[in-house]
Structure formats: C-alpha cells, structure tokens
Amino acid sequence: MVIIVGSGAGGAILAMELAKSNVPVTIIEKGKYIDSKDAFNYYDKYNGSVDLLTATCVGGSTMVSMANMVRALDEELYDYGINLSEEYDYVENLIKVHGLDDTHIGKGTQLFLDAAEELGLNPIKMPKAIYEEKCIQCGQCAFGCPVDAKWTGKHFVDIAIENGAEFIDEAEITDLITEDNRIKGVKFIKNGKEEILHSDTVVLSAGAIGSALILRKIGIDAGRELFFDPFVSVGGVIKDINFNTEVQMAGLVVGKNFVLSPHYSSFIPSKIGGDAEPKDILSIMVKTSDECKGYMTGDGDVVKINTINDIRYLAEGAAVAGFILEKAGVNPATIASTVYRGAHPGGSAAIGKFVDSNLETEIKGLFVDDASVLPISPGKPPILTILALSKRLADYLIG
C-alpha cells in the first residue's frame, strides 16, 4: 500500500495513476471533502507579516487556482536528470490544456492582448484547464468554481476513489514511523483519536509548508528556505468594462523578470477612490520569481525577506503593466496598485538538497511530491510542473 498525505495537484494525480494500476492507495487529507463552489471558505490563514494564498481541503490550492497550466523550470530540472517532456504531453492531453476559445475571451482581456501586441510584448492566450462548455464566465475561479468548470485535484481524487483508493479527510499527521532509516507508516489524528497506518511507501503531498513541517517531525530540517511568487495587481478605470466578471488571467505576457496577466483585484477600487466600482476596473497581475529568502518558523508561520531584486522585478513589471493599461484605454490618472502578496510557496524540501531525482528523501520509501521539491521559484503557475513530476513519480513507483 502507498500512503499519500495531501490531495493537491501532486497527491491527486499520483493517487489516481496508482489506483488505476491496481496499487492499493490511502489518501490522508488534513482538510475536508468539499464542493468546489465552497472552496473560498478554506483559504489558509498566516501571520500578519505575509499575505500568502493557499487552501486546505480536498484538491488543495487547485480548488482556488485559475487553472493556469504553463511549463516551468525545464532547464533547472534537467540539471538534476529530470526530463518531463513526455509527462507534460501526457498531462496536457489528460486535462485538455488549451488557450480559451474566443467565446470566453472577454472585452477587458482582449484589450490587454491587443495593447500588449501593439507594444511589441508578444502576448498569448494563457494555457488553461477550463472547459468552455461548462464555464459561465463569472470571474469566480479564485473563490472556487460554482459550476465545476475547471480542472482541480478533486477530479483525480474522485477517480482514485472509484478505482479503489481510500480517502480519509479531516485527518492531521502527527508523526512518521521509521525504523532503520526506512519509512514504516504514519500516525494521524481523526475525530480526536490517534490512529496508525503502516506502509513501506509514504508520499508527502501536503504542500510546501505542510510537507516541510511533517519532515521536521523526524529530524529532517526542511523549510529553512522557502520561495513564493510575489505579485501585485495594477489597475485603473474604464467605465463599465465589466472585466470583473470575465474569466481571469486568460492572457499572458512573459517578460525577462516577470509575467503579466489580466486579473481583477477587489482591492483596486478602494485604492483608486472616487466613484470607481468593480465593473469599471481593468487590472493586470504582475508576478515574479523570488530569491528563496523566506523560511518557516517552528509552528509553520511564513517569514518572507524581500531582496533588492524581488522589489526591482516587481517594479519593472508594474511599469510595463501601466503602459499596457494606458494603451488599452485606462485613464492613467486612475492607475493604482494593490499591496504585495504571494502565491505558489515552494522550495522547502528541494531536489538536490532533501530529495533525489526520484523525489525520495534520505529515509527509504519516504517521498515528497509537491512544490516543496522545486529547486527555485518558477515565477509562473507551477501546477502543470507538479502534475508532470507526479506522473513521473507514479511511473517510478509502479515500476
């Protein structure tokens, strides 16, 4: 039997692939099994020093993601002997990654694409796993899709269960059981009672913070380095644009040190003031990689140290976003920015430091399979890369 801790992108596809190959699987999920429309209620809360977007529930942060699917860190992973080209092809076909049909490209997104093209920025449609036949174009992706029109880890968990996997939710790992440098099982709390589950193969897919905290329970000092992708949203007024109800982040500009994507932020109207309403805002997310100078405290709080480059790259991206907005017809006098936030934490148990190229730790049979293992910050949505790494691990475990 394989025990998988967590059901986000990594754990979900791993469970599905193993179960479909008749490998006994038990998934232990700290959060609840929920409907996608309720995912907004399961965002995690961190200390006041950092605004980091993650969720704890079935499917993990995929439930509140924009379903953006871009390849990332190809060269960096290849340096560790990891070539994901076949796995990328497999996953992209499996979840039907594509740029949205024009029917689902709203007016604000089209203005972004056209303005960026005029400025020579080579915009493209964002590769996504959203299914137009179900999508109602409500702009609520980050709150949990009300009609289940995007891919989430929950979809793969359900398939795993259909193929015989056991799913235990609202269960928190309290310890790992090891013997002679080998994994032997896990201890967890369910309904206030500690239980033990034995296995010679345990895979931690609890996210960069959760997996690192579990590793610390057996003396593996993970989480002393941590990245997340810093971002701000820059926006201004175009009266009655109604961008806030469009499919978000449906376009993409890839710069040298940042990425830009049209994204409505509810914080923008208050930053602008006056009579600006949500329906009047066109805004752009500016996202960059960071230099992995964050870390986790003993109780899992996140501390982020901003470097000069972190701030410089965000400023560069924000300036370019301003040019795009003005070209798109935004009144430049109304342009404002949100505060700094973060998404996609990772690097807490990186390949080459805590796991090998097969994602196995120094403890035989104990693997890590989530953004923890990414060697550097991608500065892009990492879900597709995690899915590809997980498919590779599934093939390895199946043998």
Language model: regions and residue ranges:
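Helical element adjacent to the flavin cofactor pocket in flavoenzyme catalytic cores
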Residues: 136-200
